[in-house]
Amino acid sequence: MSLANFFNEIAFKWQKEWENSKVYEANPETDKPKKFITVAFPYTNSPLHIGHGRTYITADIYARYLRMKGYNVLFPFAFQFTGTPILSISESVKRGDEEIISTFVNIYQIPKEEIEKFSDPTYLAEYFKNNMKNTAKKLGLGIDWRREFTTVDPIFEKFVQWQYRKLMELGYIKREDSPVAYCPRDEFPVGMHDTKGDVEPEITDLDGIYFPSGDYFFIAATPRPETIFGAVALLVNPEADYVIATDSLNRKVIISRQAYDKLKYQISFREEGEKKGKDLVGMIAKNPVTEKEIKVLPSKFVDPSIGTGVVMAVPSHEPLHYIALTELKEEFELIPVIKTDELGELPGVEAVGLAQTRNPAELKDYIDTIYRIEYHKGIMREDLVDLVPNFMKEFVKDKIAGKLVKDAREKTRELLDMLNSRITIYEISNGPVYCRCGAEIVVKVIKGQWFIDYSNPIWKTSVLKSLDKINFIPTDSKKEMEKIIFNLQPRAFTRSRGLGVRLPWDEKEIIDSLSDSTIYTAFYTIVHKLKYPISLLSDKFWDYILLDRGTADEISKELGIPKEQLEEIKSEFKYWYPVDSRHSGRDLIQNHLPYYLFHHFAIFGEKFLPRQIVTNGFIRVGGKKMSKSFGNIYPLNRAIDEYGVETVRIALTSTSSISDDIEFNSNIAKSIAEQLKKIHDLISKLLEIEGVNERRDPDVWLLSIFRRYIEDVDKAYENLDLRTVYMTVYYTIYETIKDYIELTNAKINKDIIKKVISIWLRLMAPITPHLAEELWHKMSNTFVVKEKFPSINEVEYNEKSLLKVEYLRSIIEDVNRLSSELGKEAEKVVIYVNDDNNLRELLKKAIIAIKDRKSLRDFMIENNVDDKTARRIYELANVLPSTIRDLIVTTDIDEEEVIVQNINFLMNKLDLREMIVYSSTDEKAPNILGKKDLALPYKPGIAIL
């Protein structure tokens, strides 16, 4: 039987037992403290992959740990049906999208007859909901499944609609014409979760300036309209296609084909014809501000997909423009517009040298520097007044000339608006970004779009202040959250079609998936009790249950719901809320988590904000983040089948710190599985040994060191330092038990080994609950997952016994290190121990001095000791293993006696033929390789022969 099958057989057996015994169904217990753990629920548009697994297993481990610590733990789960991801996949299947269908067939192993049914988005969502639930169960997640729901359940819709009426009352909802990222194929606004690669489309604005040219107008796009005074040419790409279109004022405008295909979603254009870029070259246009005639010139550096595909050339301040015009060998004028102390009069000209070096990065840095300095420190030149016609001179003199660039920019826009020569153009600044359907995202100006006003200063400030009351794991995620919240702007939150909750006051609009998933964690606390007709769940019902408004008598009388049931529902909400630990991937810091906090603060105030937010890194496969484009999506079901549940639980959570990405590969998984099998076999074997009753130093040492393990692992679980838990529980303890067996010559103390195994299994139960349960039942009939977490009070602590064995282990480590440095295997070892009591006392004082942060000089003066001795002892105190250093301050051992009594153990561990022990103070002892002179207390001199 493969290791995967071996562990899965164990896992599935205990999962059934736990489910039958309702182990994870949590109900209020007023005499017991609670912990409410939640994870960001998944989109049901494909099966769960190992990236999901990291977040869900981490939360499950934490929930299991807290349950064992005596808390009443609720860990629920639900499914996101809302919005465009599901609809996009469904429509892709309907179109016969080969990439999507191939992914379902080849990666997720879904039968083709099922895939054909995915053209119905509801069927698709239900299919993957059931698939995800089965996977979550296979993972061993301790979910209270009574509380599951989907975001299209009618009862959930009532809950969300109540929330949005509250937000409207509070003034956080507004409606306006505004640019949004938009999929032209699916015809709805999109966000991060709607795009390939989960890229958040970022919108920036440009100024489109009209340059008249006979019967036409070229529209040139620029981020720096104030430089128009220095525009001396228009540049077009001679190889590109250009469109002649009529605007709302019946002006015939010229822009690139690619620009037209994007801008038609923002501006009222009507296509009239088409021209090649090369046919536009030679036309004469007019600068609308200076009224100077300027040429239309060819330049392949013009990207027809950016802006309008027409560039106004300002060579005096734009290095690329200067380079382009220079390459044409055309005569052109250089008109300085902005002056600064840092840059020359014509900074664009200075780029020639950089261009000749052919160093694009250096040139880009120079251009960015020009933009930054001119915007923040630049002043518009006074002589700009001389460049404009008389009717503009007064405006330019009063509003633009001599003014700071950042102020003049707005005034230049005002001037262009008065001339009816400017429009605002929106671009995807981090484009191209693609919808999941494959279409490139554009910007569309939507009339009457509904927004949540995350820019509201009072709301935003309140949320920022509240972050101090939340514990963040990892801690640096708080700073990232602060930055995101500070920069949040109003966000479009409705779609015109798709699955989801209807906007209560505009039912043709659907609330999007990031906006109906903000306070849904409150819904978990009561959903299993809401068995009433939808019509009864009015706003007054939610106000009473969630906001404690009104009385049970009033609500009962109005809705016909028994008073006792209302009070019970409200009591359950108040018992569980707020969330004690909110878990997600770190990508959700960009959107979901800030929205989660904003909405909680708006609806509930500060008291119901989550007490902790945990964000984990990603899973990488083949050294890359999982992506369909890389072909490295790894379904969770496949991982479980290939490696086993317990292996997957460790591999996805515990081989790295929580903030770091984890590499998932076959070698790592197989290594974990093999170690788990070793642990299984070792414990099984130990429980069969009859053992002895005699208590010896190794027995007491084992109990004492387990006290330390309990402390370390407890702290690590609390801080979600799962790597420390993993290394301690699955490797360090395993090696410790093996050392114990060797120290006792396999004559184990039966009572002590059972006690230690009991502790070991409970330490591993949060991460590998199935393995722990299987082995626990060789000792007990109770469920280990319901047992108490180990306490240090369960084991006795003897410093002397602990020091003896830790001293032996340090010798083993030193011999191995020396062998490695010498490049040879040790066969014979000579050990010199230093039993000078004066030096031993001095070492204790050195350890205390270092703890008190005293310098070497202070230590020497206080103890009246010579420089050489003080330095050696002080340095030793610094490098001794902490396991020894902390003990020798309060206890002591006879080093030579300890080595002699355990010489067989040392020789077996080191695979030695011979070991000899001398006292370094024995004058008759030989000084082999000078090691006798090097011996210090607890740091013997070691000669390898």
Swiss-Prot record:
UniProt cross-references to CDD domains, sorted A to Z: Anticodon_Ia_Leu_AEc (cd07959)
Keyword Acetylation: no
SUPFAM superfamilies reported in the protein's UniProt record: Anticodon-binding domain of a subclass of class I aminoacyl-tRNA synthetases (SSF47323), Nucleotidylyl transferase (SSF52374), ValRS/IleRS/LeuRS editing domain (SSF50677)
Motif 'HIGH' region location, chain numbering: 42-52
InterPro entries documented for this protein: aa-tRNA-synth_Ia (IPR002300), Leu-tRNA-lgase_arc (IPR020791), Leu-tRNA-synth_Ia_arc/euk (IPR004493), M/V/L/I-tRNA-synth_anticd-bd (IPR013155), Rossmann-like_a/b/a_fold (IPR014729), tRNAsynth_Ia_anticodon-bd (IPR009080), Val/Leu/Ile-tRNA-synth_edit (IPR009008)
Gene Ontology annotations of biological process type: leucyl-tRNA aminoacylation
One CC-aspect GO term: cytoplasm
E.C. number(s) listed in UniProt: 6.1.1.4
EC top class, as a word: ligase
A GO term, aspect molecular function: leucine-tRNA ligase activity
Subcellular localization: Cytoplasm
Keyword flag Electron transport: no
Catalytic activity: tRNA(Leu) + L-leucine + ATP = L-leucyl-tRNA(Leu) + AMP + diphosphate
Gene3D superfamilies referenced in this protein's UniProt entry, alphabetically: Class I aminoacyl-tRNA synthetases (RS), HUPs, Isoleucyl-tRNA Synthetase, Domain 1, leucyl-tRNA synthetase, Valyl/Leucyl/Isoleucyl-tRNA synthetase, editing domain
Keywords, sorted A to Z: Aminoacyl-tRNA synthetase, ATP-binding, Cytoplasm, Ligase, Nucleotide-binding, Protein biosynthesis
Residues engaged in binding ATP: K628
Motif ('KMSKS' region) on chain: 625-629
UniProt cross-references to NCBIfam families, sorted A to Z: leuS_arch, PRK12300.1
Family assignment from sequence similarity: Belongs to the class-I aminoacyl-tRNA synthetase family.
Identification of the protein by name: Leucine--tRNA ligase 1
The gene coding this protein: leuS1
